[in-house]
Amino acid sequence: MSRINKFVLTVSLLIFIMISAVACGIYTQMVKERVYSLKQSVIDTAFAVANIAEYRRSVAIDLINTLNPTEEQLLVGLRTAYADSVSPSYLYDVGPYLISSDECIQVKEFEKNYCADIMQVVKYRHVKNTGFISFDGKTFVYYLYPVTHNRSLIFLLGLERFSLLSKSLAMDSENLMFSLFKNGKPVTGDEYNAKNAIFTVSEAMEHFAYLPTGLYVFAYKKDVYLRVCTLIIFFAALVAVISGASCLYLVRRVINRGIVEKEAIINNHFERVLDGGLFFSAADVKKLYSMYNSAFLDDLTKAMGRKSFDEDLKALPEKGGYLCLFDVDKFKNINDTFGHLLGDEVLMKVVKILKSQIPVDKGKVYRFGGDEFAVIYTGGTLEELLSILKEIVHFQVGSINLSTSIGVAHSNECPTVERLKMLADERLYKSKKNGRAQISWQ
């Protein structure tokens, strides 16, 4: 695995861990807050029930203090008052009942009468208290409020309704669990199982006088919590994979672009990045181009210099290709007859012709000095090379006809580069000996 791949993998892993940890942490905190909100909803529900029970007691006391009614008159007055101000239907299942030491009267009409059961179960009839009462296969929370020294009102609320009302006030109620235990036995709420619950909170609630005594248990459904966390982790993994792939793509593009720029500069193809690249501005490229020319190129012809030739020749046996040595025929006579300015034009023209014919990825032109040149060709066949070299066997500068003599040798013909140079040089002189203006490759 490359260093880049390791780096991208590390970044992706960090992204995955960070998103998973942060998102799951936030979700966990939300779940815990919802569990505590359910606890508060139970307290608020009990408080609301107690307040309405207290309101109904105050109605009865006002009637007694104002009218000093008989039992029958008090009952009629309560029914009338409650009819004028009906309590919310979601709070009460049955009642209230007016009870004394030896009598129980149903205040609301047209309901099932539980007086006999109440008289049998409720022991403290003249002391304010709350608790549980069960009859007819149902369990109720009861609130008992004295209205006179020997009469009290008792209000009943079904535990199932109490539980539903409490959960309805909390967020995400369908995934919350609420159970109430009395003497170690479940009284109401969800079927609590520790294996299926998470973030369990339990409290006796003894310090709340308006709550029935018991153990209140609040929790969140474990399977829902784990399912959401799994989705979060999957999403984090997806984001990490996409981020990693994008990062790897961008890094590889940057590196590939850098490689292209490096090779363009190293191989003297500055035109590819002259307009500015990823790592080098146009000004940087021009400076590098100038430095490169000074170090590696012939100032006059812009052919590669002797240093580059020696380096490329060493690599030729491994790559496989041709070495061509040539010079301009009777170049001294040209200089003596027409002057050095024309001589320079001749040298530049030879290099220009070859550069226009040789693809940049297949060969290079070198100048050793004077009219001595070389070509290293690695990208094609002998026929292709001969076709290129024929362009300089005969050529013109202005109206002057000129020619070159060329010797060609292949790297497979010689065991060393020194012998390869000697063979190409021998064939160059063979071309001159045979009348110049020709190519010798055998």
UniProtKB/Swiss-Prot annotation:
GO molecular function terms noted in the UniProt entry: diguanylate cyclase activity; GTP binding; metal ion binding
Coiled-coil residues: none
Lipid modification (S-diacylglycerol cysteine), residues: 24
Keyword Chloroplast part of the UniProt annotation: no
List of residues binding Mg(2+): 327, 371
Keywords: Cell membrane, GTP-binding, Lipoprotein, Magnesium, Membrane, Metal-binding, Nucleotide-binding, Palmitate, Signal, Transferase, Transmembrane, Transmembrane helix
Subcellular location field: Cell membrane
Subunit text: Homodimer.
Stated name of the protein: Probable diguanylate cyclase DgcI
Source species of the chain: Escherichia coli (strain K12)
Gene name, Swiss-Prot/TrEMBL: dgcI
